[in-house]
């Protein structure tokens, strides 16, 4: 699809709302916060918005960006690619954003980033891990997270070297993110000498996976790896347990929300579930004061909250470092300078990937909470 097609005829699909952090007269630096603010994955959108809002408030209180205030614009893509392109056009054409924090689902980030590239603005995704996000040569696309080909290695290593599994079922949701991560994990399993006993896709939005569970049972899998998001992971693990399957269930950073226990039907179903995610940013000393501020306000900064906060910090540092609110100059600055964030020091390579990835394994308890394993 040509880039021009991204910019025409689809603005009517946009679903977005504008929320400023200051008066219009002072809100000169417009930054979009794009992600699933509605729909099944809205909990991730809330994490994005909470993190970005607190960061913008703190940065504005300290003088803003080159003396100007940040104004945030909420852009809801519902993790739907067509809607993502629509809101990207809205951010560029109507809201005049010069930077974006987003999107969440890789299948949304990839097409939306073409719009941003054509418009010459900079974007940082806190959570899109598919390698193609940064493999297309876009000059202004960055991540605050790792990549699936890094995360899949960690998952595969853990399944083979720690769980000692010989029979592994690999399940995915047929989406760019979920299937890409499942394939990366499968590749690592195969590299370590373990051939999957089942490789199967499910459909996002479905809730009845009993037929799939029957296939998993027949495969004799000791571990079930699922590449996808919590709205499907929850019902899948519950139906496994209801059918008496005791195989370990492992997933990814698409389930890093307390909503996993809700979609599973209760915390008892997610006890023992494993997942890969970056090292818990709430434990990093650099972010202690910010974490305490969130908690004092009654919000637990789980998942991608601090990733979003750090993304706003990095954009502010880049514009300030460049000495102008010029996205191209900010992107070049970010590729050659480290930024101290609530998640510690971050540095990017020329593609926009972090130079250091820190994926680890977490386990869910019987209270529906996840904890980083040593």
Curated annotation (Swiss-Prot):
PANTHER family found in the cross-reference section: AMINO ACID BINDING PROTEIN (PTHR47151:SF2), LEU/ILE/VAL-BINDING ABC TRANSPORTER SUBUNIT (PTHR47151)
| Predominant place of localization | periplasm
The answer, when asked if Signal is one of the entry's keywords, is yes
A single cellular component GO annotation: outer membrane-bounded periplasmic space
Q: Which keywords annotate this record?
A: Amino-acid transport, Periplasm, Signal, Transport
CDD domains named among the record's database cross-references: PBP1_ABC_LIVBP-like
Per UniProt, subcellular location reads as: Periplasm
Q: Secretion signal: which residues?
A: 1-27
Q: Which family does it belong to?
A: Belongs to the leucine-binding protein family.
Q: Does the keyword Magnesium apply?
A: no
State the protein's purpose. Answer: Binds primarily proteinogenic amino acids.
Q: Which domain of life is it from?
A: Bacteria
Name of the protein: Amino acid binding protein
Q: What is the lineage of its organism?
A: Bacteria, Pseudomonadati, Pseudomonadota, Gammaproteobacteria, Pseudomonadales
């Amino acid at each position: 699809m040509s880039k021009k097609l991204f910019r025409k005829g689809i603005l009517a699909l946009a679903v977005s709302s504008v929320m400023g952090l200051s008066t219009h007269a002072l809100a000169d630096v417009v930054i979009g916060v794009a992600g699933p603010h509605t729909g099944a994955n809205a909990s991730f959108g809330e994490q994005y918005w909470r993190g970005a809002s607190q960061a913008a408030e703190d940065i504005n209180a300290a003088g803003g960006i080159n003396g100007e205030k940040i104004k945030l614009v909420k852009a809801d893509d519902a993790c739907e690619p067509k809607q993502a392109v629509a809101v990207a056009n809205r951010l560029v054409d109507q809201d005049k954003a010069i930077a974006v924090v987003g999107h969440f689902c890789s299948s949304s980030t990839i097409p939306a980033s073409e719009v941003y590239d054509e418009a010459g603005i900079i974007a940082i995704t806190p959570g899109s891990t598919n390698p193609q996000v940064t493999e297309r040569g876009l000059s202004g696309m960055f991540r605050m997270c790792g990549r699936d080909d890094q995360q899949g290695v960690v998952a595969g290593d853990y399944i083979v070297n720690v769980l000692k599994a010989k029979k592994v079922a690999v399940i995915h949701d047929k989406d760019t993110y979920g299937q890409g991560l499942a394939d990366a994990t499968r590749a690592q399993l195969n590299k370590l000498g373990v051939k999957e006993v089942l490789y199967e896709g499910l459909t996002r939005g479905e809730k009845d996976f009993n037929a799939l569970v029957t296939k998993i049972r027949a495969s004799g899998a000791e571990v079930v790896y699922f590449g996808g998001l919590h709205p499907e992971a929850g019902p899948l693990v519950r139906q496994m347990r209801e059918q008496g399957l005791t195989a370990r269930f492992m997933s990814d950073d698409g389930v890093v929300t307390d909503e996993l226990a809700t979609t599973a039907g209760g915390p008892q179903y997610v006890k023992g579930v494993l997942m890969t995610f970056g090292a818990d940013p709430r434990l990093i000393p650099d972010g202690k004061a910010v974490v305490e501020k969130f908690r004092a306000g009654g919000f637990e900064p789980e998942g991608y909250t601090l990733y979003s906060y750090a993304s706003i910090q990095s954009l502010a540092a880049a514009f300030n470092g460049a000495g102008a609110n010029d996205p191209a100059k900010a992107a070049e600055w970010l590729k050659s300078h480290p930024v101290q964030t609530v998640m510690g020091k971050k540095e990017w390579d020329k593609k926009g990937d972090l130079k250091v990835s820190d994926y680890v394994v977490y386990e869910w308890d019987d209270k529906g909470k996840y904890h980083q394993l040593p």
